[in-house]
Amino acid sequence: LKNLGLDLAIFYSTSKEVFEGFKNQGFDSILCSVDFDDYAKKRDEEIAKIIPMQTFFDSFITHPNDCLKADKTPYKVFTPYYKNLEFIWNSYRLEEFETNKNLKLISYDFDFIPTLENMGFIKQTLPDFLQKNPDELLKDFEQKIDNYKIDRDFFDKNATSNLSVHLRFGLISPRQVFNKIKELRARTENKEFFVRELFWREFYNYILFHFP
């Protein structure tokens, strides 16, 4: 964010209180990435009653309604779902959202950060991979991807990309991961296997959406 001339404001309260505060300060809309789990849907419905929301679809590659069977019902099995999306996963590159160059930083005390103790947490020692940004993890993974298909099943081997947390919290989009994996200097079949795992993540969200 700071590379874009922006910063991150952190709030610790209920969603209702935070967004009522935004409305009282004169904000006219909220822009955010859509989420499909039950909690997120209820939260966003509550927020939308307070202040208009404009959602973007960047947490996943495909929208759950964009891949249906011929009878317009959702898939329940991964393989036919995945085959239906071949035109996507067989692509060399996916289009990514561009950053708005006209975003401006508002006046706010960005140095204020609630402590873990304030929020009822105990400080933990984070694993090494959480100290790295997504680009660093992808660079590390380039050395492991050719053995990923076999080694990923062994817990004693650091064989995965370690990107799950970064994907979940929007530090990198799945489209960016897809594109960066396709660019790696690795055997095509090994890159395709990892891309298939990305679509397993898509399918999990797909099932959650259609069968809550």
Positions of the model-derived regions?
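Trp/Phe/Arg-rich N-terminal binding region typifying the photolyase-homology
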Residues: L1-N90, N190
